[in-house]
């Protein structure tokens, strides 16, 4: 199974939302919008936009596909999809509040780990999302790693900078 199926594949949309929004926020900071003069703050903003984007699927036309991804051991997969969507929204908002940003980032990273079995099921059972094949497992694992890494960087930017010195 190829990592990418074709150029129009939407597997990368959350990644693109993260990268483009982070860079756009940083460009605004470079243009003089002082609250956005830090990469860490712009990354938190990009992550917040990404999680709001992904949360929207929990109630949109992809909802049935997300419900089908929930591992069978969980009762009420419809409720699980709704709850995880709400958690993504709260986490996104928490990333934007300095006092809660680190905790929100850690909680979202844990949420991504908890949701990974649904992605495994979708890939192994050849489920579809929005009428398209689910993300191949190697790409999904790589994306999860990128998202979790971004959350860790957003949660502890000063600690990572000191560790690198």
Describe the function of each predicted region:
Residues 2-165:
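Membrane-interface extramembranous regions
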């Amino acid at each position: 199974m190829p990592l990418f199926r074709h150029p129009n594949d939407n597997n990368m949309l959350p990644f693109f939302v993260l990268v483009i929004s982070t860079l756009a926020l940083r460009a605004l900071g470079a243009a003089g919008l002082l609250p956005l003069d830090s990469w860490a703050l712009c990354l938190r903003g990009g992550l917040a936009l990404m999680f709001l984007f992904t949360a929207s699927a929990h109630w949109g036309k992809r909802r049935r596909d997300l419900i089908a991804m929930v591992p069978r051991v969980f009762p009420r997969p419809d409720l699980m999809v709704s709850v995880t969507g709400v958690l993504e929204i709260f986490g996104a908002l928490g990333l934007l509040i300095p006092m809660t940003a680190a905790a929100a980032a850690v909680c979202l990273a844990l949420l991504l780990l908890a949701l990974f079995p649904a992605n495994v099921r979708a890939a192994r059972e050849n489920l579809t999302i929005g009428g398209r094949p689910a993300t191949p497992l190697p790409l999904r694992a790589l994306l999860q790693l990128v998202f979790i890494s971004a959350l860790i960087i957003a949660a502890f930017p000063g600690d990572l900078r000191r560790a690198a010195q």
